[in-house]
Amino acid sequence: MTDITPVQNDVDVNGNNVNDDVSSNLKRPIDQGDPSNGLAEEENPANNQLHLKKARLDGDALTSSPAGLAENGIEGATLAANGENGYNATGSGAEDEQQGLKKEEGGQGTKQEDLDENSKQELPMEVPKEPAPAPPPEPDMNNLPQNPIPKHQQKHALLAIKAVKRLKDARPFLQPVDPVKLDIPFYFNYIKRPMDLSTIERKLNVGAYEVPEQITEDFNLMVNNSIKFNGPNAGISQMARNIQASFEKHMLNMPAKDAPPVIAKGRRSSAQEDAPIVIRRAQTHNGRPKRTIHPPKSKDIYPYESKKPKSKRLQQAMKFCQSVLKELMAKKHASYNYPFLEPVDPVSMNLPTYFDYVKEPMDLGTIAKKLNDWQYQTMEDFERDVRLVFKNCYTFNPDGTIVNMMGHRLEEVFNSKWADRPNLDDYDSDEDSRTQGDYDDYESEYSESDIDETIITNPAIQYLEEQLARMKVELQQLKKQELEKIRKERRLARGSKKRGKRSKGRSGSKNASSKGRRDKKNKLKTVVTYDMKRIITERINDLPTSKLERAIDIIKKSMPNISEDDEVELDLDTLDNHTILTLYNTFFRQYESSSGASNGLDGTSGVTRDASSLSPTSAGSRKRRSKALSQEEQSRQIEKIKNKLAILDSASPLSQNGSPGQIQSAAHNGFSSSSDDDVSSESEEE
């Protein structure tokens, strides 16, 4: 007989406290290193002991007779005692019986019905050596009930399940338990009928429930399985209880079985609202029933119309594309268009390497579907897909093959049709972009030119328009004043330059004089002055014959009343400014500097001024000079100039007819600038 020594309920053999309400976790094994373990460890080397049952024990003693052990659901003479059990198992069965008799005599015996609930303890049991097979999946489609729950109850239960699935605590229960993935191979040894939310939802969809109570039973089964396998105090068990409370709350509003389903009253379509109400009798006078009148469907339910673009230009383009595609798919081309009507199926056609060559497949059927769905925004997009069909054909089928030749033949048909594509520039993209119920689209129907601006009565707009008009007038006035100011400044600048030239005469360095002459020659005159008229009057008779004829032609063009044979009298006051400027800029610009030198402020002649310009005083008065010339240098330069003049006089045709004074004057007038350049250059060299 085994001697059983009672131990305090919350203290183990090592003196450690043990929780009274021990968890029934089915996966917790017995520690093999515990010296108080009474099981034969050599029989269970894999540590596969599990606690399966709880024994009711009191805080002081345990019934020691075999009958008492049987009452507690324990059979056998060997008990396992570890840190979580409330007793130790030692000795023989006879000693246990004697120990129990002594406790009964001392008044310490305890009956089974008086045991406290907090003294529950677990007893070990061996784990199965092989995992149990998985039960058949639910629902069984061959055994569905003939009278499932009504549709309105089914809908309410589905809504309740979907609401529970959205909870955070429902994540572990969404799908069936996978023992392989979760590494729990013996799950089906303890859970004979698994259940989860997706299985309940699937059973609802196929009509596997006859009454709503069966739905609740399956949900409770799922919760109980979790508590049984993980223990009542596990976190996942608490999550199961949370979603159970939420599910029960939803199921409280389950409608009755005979209640009619609630039909949601939708909004009547515009076509139904506009349709007149006509009362019709069931039968006419001859007894024949009338046909039921159904209102037409609303236009907004047609997907084709909703996808139709608002642009009239795009509609015309897609209409032409549809005609081209219809021609390509016509029966008259059936002998060579059939390979391109449908997508290529590499499996049925035994073309396993088709997609290795063709990365973007396309066919005429797909193009037709895209056209019907208005997926093309331009004609170029349609052309690109059609060209892609032929490109794929030529890529996969080499030249000379039958399909390649079919593709070329069909492409010729496409090219001939595509060459007649219309010019869509006449269609405005926003011309027809409106609908009857859309204010913005209706407003775009009218262009800005069709709106009468006189109907605008907003005072702010009118005030801004008045301000804008006044600012435009002020802007024009400011521009005019600025132009007058610029013209006046230019006139003053030209007048000051002329006066400065008259006072300074021909003084100045070579660079300054040459630059001034270059600017005058290159710059055309734009304003008629008195000097221009004087130069034209004095110099026009000195022009060569060819230039004189051209000048006369210019004058005649400005005076259309003069005939070809009439004699032209030059009166500058009768000529317009344009003609005077044309004559001056064409023939007399080069005489401006010489005229200023020949007619100075002192009234002396040009010969006197030219001679004085060659004097030492005149040469020394230049602004830019290296140093004053000596008397010998001045004499030498004068001799050089005289020699040049003599050479020019001897070569000039005027020397035969003109007087010496006239020749000298002409020479001085014609070559004064060159002599000045020589003087200035020599002075700088010195």
From Swiss-Prot:
Residues 518-598 form the NET domain. This is Bromodomain-containing factor 1. Residues 9-25 have a biased composition (Low complexity). It is found in: Nucleus. InterPro entries: Bromo_chromatin_reader, Bromodomain, Bromodomain-like_sf, Bromodomain_CS, NET_dom, NET_sf. It comes from Saccharomyces cerevisiae (strain ATCC 204508 / S288c). Disruption phenotype: Heterochromatin spreading downstream of the silent mating-type locus HMR. The modification Phosphoserine is found at S270, S429, S615, S659.
